[in-house]
Structure formats: structure tokens, C-alpha cells
């Protein structure tokens, strides 16, 4: 088997995780208590969904996941929620005091105490796998736990499981909406280790997803539940081919191979279509060309950044439901003729497609309509640099005055780490600039020197 372990860190990671596991269970027909009426072979783990669920002798399906937070309130919601019987109690790890939006607390003081316990649990999950394929890591980089403990765990996973791929689903601070003053510090410090220790990172940002909910689903005031359900659809689409037997399957390592041209250039944009409410879906014909066009729309991007400002280096289209390769090829051919979707000159083809015949499921009583077919796109576009330059700018404004820095230094960090992380991000922005430059291979051959 090619198992995958999911790690959900901090409030954002846990709440997105909740939405994901709820959706996985619906897709596989697994009840909230872990039983699966349709699974006739009890205790035999040879089905495709066993990449994400392990099976006990009693026929209970347990997610291969751990939830970690430095304070108990969010995890207590999982412990008492409707899926409380699904998870093994040891998979829900919480500390007593939170990271207080402080990267240094999550990474050095408070996080250090809990990280060995987490790795211990990960080790147990890994021992339970026959051929561990990699990790999915869910966190936000604006807070303290997601950024600090998130980076710490990633660093330790690199040491313990060096060859296994790590995919991050990372929630970045939004341009306008902010939940903490020190977000820019936490994000810069955390991205510093995301650069080194993840193989692919998918950037999400709340504001972009709010806008999609408002515009496409007509939800006047979207809640985190609305956002997380939309995020979970994306993550579900990406992992469909790992959990179901499909037509054109896509492996986790395949994402890396097809999307990452240089090790550092691994921050992806994602989009999903059709995002449509039930009332509207009734009147619309959502054909393959239509949904394919929709995922390339700047307004469908799940991070606030305009792909028209950059160039595509690679792009992964994952279709699910009633889709045949002929339609996909036609739709992709149309996209290629469009002037709006520009590829870098050194990567002329740039499309990787996956098809899975399992139609998308929706959470009952949720916002999304039940549709026959859907597509999720993950793309590597040079415009992602906008996300970083935005955060860097805010970082610079605060750091010039050394505002709030004493909170970090007081938790055992050194001021040098700030400038080191900031320089790393400046280099990253430069890397993106060079990759998008025209005819890059002629003038400078130093692109491979990383």
C-alpha cells in the first residue's frame, strides 16, 4: 500500500482537517463511528481507501492522521464533535498553554515540550504502514502554533523520514483581513522552513476564499465552516486518485515531479470548479470546457494573487466524475490557444491531467451543489511571488522599528533569525523573477545552482 499520514497543526490545521475527514467519510461511506457498511472484507486492508484509513480487526476505520495544538479548546471540539469516535484518542494531542500568536513559543519554548510526543505518535502511525508514501501537513502560518510548531515538526520529519515527500496545505495571511498584528513575522519565519522542508506547498488564503463564497455561493457572511468545506473539496480532489481506483491516477510524488521545476519554486496556487449553489446548478450546464475555463479564472484562485501577472510553469488538472479523456484534451487545447494563460518559454506543454470516475460528494446541508463533474487545478505560477512580496513589505515596516521583536527574543530566539529568514524570502522573490524572465536559458546559466 502507499499510505499517507495527515498532520493537522494549530487551530486552522485542525478545523480544515475536520472538514476534510468529514468529506472523506462521506465519499467512502464511512459512518461517524468508523464503521463502513459497504466494506465486506473486515480487517483486510487492500482497498484504495486504506491509503488514508487503517482498519482494525473489528472492522473500524481509523484515519491515519494526528491533530496537534498547544491549547486544548479546538481539539476538545473534535473530542466532543460528531466524529469523536472516528479518531483514536492518542491521535488528538493538545498542550495546556497556547503559543499566543508567537512563532518563538511554538518553535522553541512551548512547542519543544510537545514535539517528541507528536513524533512518537507519527512513528506509531508510520509503523502501521506497509509503504508510507508521504505526509500531508495542514497549518496556517499567521498564528503561533501553525507557524512555530508547524516548522518544528516539518524540520523533525525531514530528519526522521528524509526521503518521504511532504505536501503542505498552508493558509497564508490575507492582504486585507488579518487576525493578528504579528502575522508578517510569523509567516516570514515559518516560510523560511517551508522552503527547506516541504516538497510542495499549496497556498490558501482566507480572503480569496471568502470572496469565492460570497460571489459564487451567494453566502452573505461566510463563516470558517463555509471556507473549510470549500478547502476540503480541493484537498479531496487532489487525493481522490490516492483513495479510489481511477482512470488516470496521480501519485503524491507525481505532483512533485510535474509541478516543481527547481526545488525552491514549489509554492502552488489552487482553484476548483464548479463552485455553485444548488439553486443555480439546476439551471446551468457545467460541461468539461466550462469548468476547465473556470479554474483558470483569476477569481477562482484560492489565494489572492493574479495569475495574469505571472507565467505558468506547470499545471495539474484533476478531473473527477463523468469526464472522458477526449473532452479533457479538447478543453486543454482551447486553453492553450488563449492569450490570457501564458506559459514560460522553457516549458511549452505544462499540463498534467488526472481523471477519476468517482463523482464529487457534498456535505449534506452544505453550500455546494451536487454536480456530475468537477475539476481541481494546482498550478505553479510566478505570480505567487506577489503573496510573498506583500508579506515581506509588512514585515519590513514593523521590523524597521523592531516592533514586537522583544516577545520573540524573550522566548529564546535570536534577532539574527529574523534577518536570516527575511533574506531567504528576498532570495525567493528573486528566484521567481528569474524563472519568469524571458529566454532565461540564454543569458544566465546559473539557474541550477541551488
Swiss-Prot record:
* UniProt KW keywords: Cytoplasm, Cytoskeleton, GTP-binding, Hydrolase, Magnesium, Metal-binding, Microtubule, Nucleotide-binding
Query: By its UniProt entry, which InterPro entries does this protein fall under?
Result: Alpha_tubulin, Beta-tubulin_BS, Tub_FtsZ_C, Tubulin, Tubulin/FtsZ-like_C, Tubulin/FtsZ_2-layer-sand-dom, Tubulin/FtsZ_GTPase_sf, Tubulin_C
UniProt enzyme class: hydrolase
Pfam families from the UniProt entry: Tubulin, Tubulin_C
Q: What organism does this protein naturally occur in?
A: Oryza sativa subsp. japonica (Rice)
Recorded protein name is Tubulin alpha-1 chain
- Protein location: Cytoplasm, Cytoskeleton
Q: Any idea what job this protein has?
A: Tubulin is the major constituent of microtubules, a cylinder consisting of laterally associated linear protofilaments composed of alpha- and beta-tubulin heterodimers. Microtubules grow by the addition of GTP-tubulin dimers to the microtubule end, where a stabilizing cap forms. Below the cap, tubulin dimers are in GDP-bound state, owing to GTPase activity of alpha-tubulin.
Q: Could you describe the post-translational modifications of this protein? A: Undergoes a tyrosination/detyrosination cycle, the cyclic removal and re-addition of a C-terminal tyrosine residue by the enzymes tubulin tyrosine carboxypeptidase (TTCP) and tubulin tyrosine ligase (TTL), respectively.
Q: Which cofactor does it need?
A: Mg(2+)
Query: What does the record give as EC number?
Result: 3.6.5.-
Single biological process term from Gene Ontology: microtubule cytoskeleton organization
Q: What SUPFAM superfamilies is this protein classified in?
A: Tubulin C-terminal domain-like, Tubulin nucleotide-binding domain-like
Tell me which family the UniProt entry assigns to this protein: Belongs to the tubulin family.
User: How is this protein organized at the quaternary level?
Assistant: Dimer of alpha and beta chains. A typical microtubule is a hollow water-filled tube with an outer diameter of 25 nm and an inner diameter of 15 nM. Alpha-beta heterodimers associate head-to-tail to form protofilaments running lengthwise along the microtubule wall with the beta-tubulin subunit facing the microtubule plus end conferring a structural polarity. Microtubules usually have 13 protofilaments but different protofilament numbers can be found in some organisms and specialized cells.
Q: Which SMART domains match?
A: Tubulin, Tubulin_C
By which gene is this protein encoded? TUBA1
Disulfide partners: none
Query: Any idea which positions bind Mg(2+)?
Result: 71
Primary site of residence: cytoplasm
Amino acid at each position: 500500500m502507499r499510505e499517507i499520514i495527515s498532520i493537522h497543526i494549530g487551530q486552522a490545521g485542525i478545523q480544515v482537517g475536520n472538514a476534510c475527514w468529514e468529506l472523506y467519510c462521506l465519499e467512502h461511506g464511512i459512518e461517524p463511528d468508523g464503521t463502513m457498511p459497504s466494506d465486506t472484507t473486515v480487517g483486510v486492508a487492500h482497498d484504495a481507501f486504506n491509503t488514508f484509513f487503517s482498519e482494525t480487526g473489528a472492522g473500524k476505520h481509523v484515519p491515519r492522521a494526528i491533530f496537534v495544538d498547544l491549547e486544548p479548546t479546538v481539539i476538545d471540539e473534535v473530542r466532543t464533535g460528531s466524529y469523536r469516535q472516528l479518531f483514536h484518542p492518542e491521535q488528538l494531542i493538545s498542550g495546556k498553554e497556547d503559543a499566543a500568536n508567537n512563532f518563538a513559543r511554538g518553535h522553541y519554548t512551548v512547542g519543544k515540550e510537545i514535539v517528541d510526543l507528536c513524533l512518537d505518535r507519527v512513528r506509531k502511525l508510520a509503523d502501521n504502514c506497509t509503504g508510507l508514501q508521504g505526509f500531508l501537513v495542514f497549518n496556517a502560518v499567521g498564528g503561533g502554533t501553525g507557524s512555530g510548531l508547524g516548522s518544528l515538526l516539518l524540520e523533525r520529519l525531514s530528519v526522521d523520514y528524509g526521503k518521504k515527500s511532504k505536501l503542505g496545505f498552508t493558509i497564508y495571511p490575507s492582504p486585507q483581513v488579518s487576525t493578528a498584528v504579528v502575522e508578517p513575522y510569523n509567516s516570514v519565519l515559518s516560510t523560511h522552513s517551508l522552503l527547506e522542508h516541504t516538497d510542495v506547498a499549496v497556498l490558501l488564503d482566507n480572503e480569496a476564499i471568502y470572496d469565492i463564497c460570497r460571489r459564487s455561493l451567494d453566502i452573505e457572511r461566510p463563516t470558517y465552516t463555509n471556507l473549510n468545506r470549500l478547502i476540503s473539496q480541493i484537498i479531496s480532489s487532489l487525493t481522490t486518485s490516492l483513495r479510489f481506483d481511477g482512470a488516470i491516477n496521480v501519485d503524491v510524488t507525481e505532483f512533485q515531479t510535474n509541478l516543481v521545476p527547481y526545488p525552491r519554486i514549489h509554492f502552488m496556487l489552487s482553484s476548483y470548479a464548479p463552485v455553485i449553489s444548488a439553486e443555480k446548478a439546476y439551471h446551468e450546464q457545467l460541461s468539461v470546457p466550462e469548468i476547465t475555463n473556470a479554474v483558470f479564472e483569476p477569481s477562482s484562485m484560492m489565494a489572492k494573487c493574479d495569475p495574469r501577472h505571472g507565467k505558468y510553469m506547470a499545471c495539474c488538472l484533476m478531473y473527477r466524475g463523468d469526464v472522458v479523456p477526449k473532452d479533457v484534451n479538447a478543453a486543454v487545447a482551447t486553453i492553450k490557444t488563449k492569450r490570457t494563460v501564458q506559459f514560460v518559454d522553457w516549458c511549452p506543454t505544462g499540463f498534467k491531467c488526472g481523471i477519476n470516475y468517482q463523482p464529487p460528494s457534498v456535505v449534506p446541508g452544505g453550500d455546494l451543489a451536487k454536480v456530475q463533474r468537477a475539476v481541481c487545478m494546482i498550478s505553479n505560477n510566478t505570480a505567487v511571488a506577489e503573496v510573498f512580496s506583500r508579506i515581506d513589505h509588512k514585515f519590513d515596516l514593523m521590523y524597521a522599528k523592531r516592533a514586537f521583536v522583544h516577545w520573540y527574543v524573550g522566548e529564546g530566539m535570536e534577532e539574527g533569525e529574523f534577518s536570516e529568514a527575511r533574506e531567504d524570502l528576498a532570495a525567493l522573490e528573486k528566484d521567481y523573477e528569474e524563472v519568469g524572465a524571458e529566454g532565461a536559458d540564454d543569458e544566465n546559466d546559473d539557474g541550477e545552482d541551488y
